[in-house]
Curated annotation (Swiss-Prot):
Disulfide bonds: none annotated. PROSITE patterns: CHALCONE_SYNTH. SUPFAM superfamilies: Thiolase-like. Substrate binds at K55, F56, Q57, R58, L267, G305, G306, R307. Homodimer. Belongs to the thiolase-like superfamily. Chalcone/stilbene synthases family. Its EC number is 2.3.1.95. It comes from the Eukaryota. The active site is at C164. GO terms for cellular component: cytoplasm. The keyword Transferase applies. This is Stilbene synthase 3. Induction: By stress. Experimentally by elicitor of P.megasperma, yeast extract and dilution of cell cultures.
Amino acid sequence: MVSVSGIRKVQRAEGPATVLAIGTANPPNCIDQSTYADYYFRVTNSEHMTDLKKKFQRICERTQIKNRHMYLTEEILKENPNMCAYKAPSLDAREDMMIREVPRVGKEAATKAIKEWGQPMSKITHLIFCTTSGVALPGVDYELIVLLGLDPCVKRYMMYHQGCFAGGTVLRLAKDLAENNKDARVLIVCSENTAVTFRGPSETDMDSLVGQALFADGAAAIIIGSDPVPEVEKPIFELVSTDQKLVPGSHGAIGGLLREVGLTFYLNKSVPDIISQNINDALNKAFDPLGISDYNSIFWIAHPGGRAILDQVEQKVNLKPEKMKATRDVLSNYGNMSSACVFFIMDLMRKRSLEEGLKTTGEGLDWGVLFGFGPGLTIETVVLRSVAI
């Protein structure tokens, strides 16, 4: 008679979860940050607010963003004038866009990841879909299964409204699924669209104005699995450990509410300070078991919530400027794409490491960290191990 422990052993993978493929995608509409203030105040019929426009221009300049991708074009906004007001009911129009566009761009990213993976789609056993954009029943995870033609028996997990920390959350969930289900192959898709948050300016809401200068659209797809098939699957990173922390006393620092005007949000000025004050605790908890205390000796994939956050974390940990280069490059070229951002950084890092002839996917280093920061205030920490190139 087979023992319960024997059955459980057979059901589980032997090795750690690994990243097997990465794909990214953006809407074709690319905006120039240097001229966005003019565009934004024109399309929202707010050019009479000259002082606020000047303030918004300064905010745009301080972001250190050069370009962002957005589904919303001037034509779409003209067809939906309520989306250009600060406080006009427009949720129906926004939701209709989300249900269509979030899975569409997600499919584009997923198709790229599946192609790199090199295995038939029939081997995908689980789907994790994450978005802060819109809500539907059945979810956009269902829509993606239809668009891709995935097996209807794929076990799916729909994560709505997690926010900017969720890149770490989906990895934490995927690691558990891959390591506890033999031969599991988990497709993660994070797809974000700012049509849910776009609105006109208000002199009494600087949080919204900062968001209009910072957030962008994008999707990333990742395939996670343990025990890679030799000569077929090529690991990119190993997922060593994961952790989540709700920072004490940080209630009200970051959050959002779904209203008739769309998704409204608030961003406390203390957010960069809260994150930087808690970053060393997160690092020590993650790396003390590995005997690592020099955080310049690891590679960094940090969610680019904004320039001030990166600056304060860099200063607090005494990081060399090059440690955040991949993160800052993604922020500069794409803006803040919420949950998808960390995977754009991961993709850039592994490609750049190969191009520069480094020995591992993690800038030539063995160990690294992935951080997600978001509503709560929540910090997600993922310890990564690179793979030899």
